Amino acid sequence: MTTRQPLYKSLYVQVLVAITIGILLGHYYPETGVALKPLGDGFVKLIKMVIAPIIFCTVVSGIAGMQSMKSVGKTGGYALLYFEIVSTIALIIGLVVVNVVKPGAGMHIDVSTLNASSVAAYAAAGAQQTTVGFLLNVIPNTVVGAFANGDILQVLMFSVLFGFALHRLGSYGKPVLDMIDRFAHVMFNIINMIMKLAPIGAFGAMAFTIGQYGVGSLVQLGYLMACFYITCLLFVLVVLGGICRAHGFSVIKLIRYIREELLIVLGTSSSESALPRMLAKMERLGAKKSVVGLVIPTGYSFNLDGTSIYLTMAAVFIAQATDTTMDITHQITLLLVLLVASKGAAGVTGSGFIVLAATLSAVGHLPVAGLALILGIDRFMSEARALTNLVGNAVATVVVAKWVKEMDNDKLASELASGGAPLVDTRPTDDLGVAEGPAR
């Protein structure tokens, strides 16, 4: 009989308490809350420090260990098909909701009175985003540069090529694969150590958010925020829930399974902060390493459902608030632009805002200065974006794994039924051979 872990030792409880304390401190002592920003920034930087090597190890081990290269192409093809379908649904849902509810109607904002300088940096970054530029950026100038900059797509591309090359070498490349597998164990143990600081990071990030923007900013544009949060919730429960039911599992149980990762994301507003743990969690759920290694990292740029909902809602909200006419032609154009632009977002705080700036610049019909309207609440909306993105990528991993028959359904059922035990830090045995994330 196993002894139940005390509540105070649960990462879930620790992060939840830290977020609560951070909110209270930021509200009652805003200056102190703002000063705690480095705690949140430091934690996110620690996570980002190991994301590139973990993706490399996971993808290379998964691809090099596969029996056939055809299965890699099949997995990638199914993943991109799923991403495109579901993210398009998310864009359309956001567009429909904002047109029905009209959260910006009646504000009658004069664009000339807006402080365009406050969003100049975002607008400049957005103007540089082009489809060709995005595609070329997937190819790193140097391998070292890809890892040094922590660019997920660049690291992923090199990892796929490295995995293919290692697979072609057969037994000759086995020593290299073994070394990479053992290196993966080291990296996952580093993650386990870093995650002990998650409550401190979540506390600092939340205290800063409330201290900097205040609870008042939540009320100021609360209608838009409420619409967005409710839309994200309905998307998760109805759309993703329907996809889950169609594939024989429950989205509620899946959310319960990744509850610790969701709380980390809630505290940091960045789905990227949970990426290393998601790789381990989804593999433990029963998905093959090759599927997890391709779907999760790729999903962080191509399957951002929460960001997709946000982009259409925010763009039309700005049009409504500034009395800018948006007929059906303009809205279809907006949707088509976002089908491409939304794939350039990444799972980091602020990327959605930059893509929104790029979209407004590309459409031309919408005032870029209107970004100033939602700048103050964007930080609060990023929580819902990041949470929806994380759940969306978890669902995508299970669904794609089922499509390509690389899912252990018995393991999936048992893990979801148990709620998932916390990831523990144990040392692998010398004869383990292949890394499988943190030891079970």
Curated annotation (Swiss-Prot):
SUPFAM superfamilies: Proton glutamate symport protein. The chain crosses the membrane at residues 15-35, 46-66, 78-98, 146-166, 190-210, 224-244, 291-311, 332-352, 354-374. Disulfide bonds: none annotated. It is a multi-pass membrane protein. This is C4-dicarboxylate transport protein. It comes from the Bacteria. Belongs to the dicarboxylate/amino acid:cation symporter (DAACS) (TC 2.A.23) family. GO terms for biological process: L-aspartate transmembrane transport. Keywords: Cell inner membrane, Cell membrane, Membrane, Symport, Transmembrane, Transmembrane helix, Transport. One of its GO terms (molecular function) is malate:proton symporter activity. GO terms for cellular component: plasma membrane. It is found in: Cell inner membrane. Responsible for the transport of dicarboxylates such as succinate, fumarate, and malate from the periplasm across the membrane. Its main location: membrane.
